[in-house]
Amino acid sequence: MESADAFADRLKTARSASQNILIFARTESLIAGENVRDALSRAEKYISAGADGIVIHSAETDGKNIFLFAEMFKDMHPDVPLVFIPTMYNSFDCDTLHQHGADIIIYANQLTRSAYKAMLAAANSILGNGCSKYADENYCESVGNILKITDGDRNDRY
């Protein structure tokens, strides 16, 4: 994990390049096995360096350290947006996460992971049936609908 000072220097450089962007700095402390105090220290440095918001992430499933971080962070910076990424602590609903201090919630990889499972199911269907008809009917969006959302003028062919 990069030192907090080195990362803060990069944030200062980004901030000096433009005031017309929002910078959200992610602290990896809890992912890297550090404690809440380290995460708070890093967040403080990142805000001082020009970050507009803080992203906090954790590999723990109970949410305990995320919620403790959020409570302490919001006491110090009530107006700074705080972003949660509940990949591992996925049993908490949005209302609960907001009550614990999240201003923004990012479901970072759930759609990619679910797409992978759907691709495996489609591939197995094609291999098992020797054709794609069943996969098309059960696992695939129609070509027409895909074209409609990606290139509206060509959807009349399907």
Protein language model regions, located:
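Alpha/beta enzyme core
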Residues: 1-87, 91-106, 114-120, 124, ...
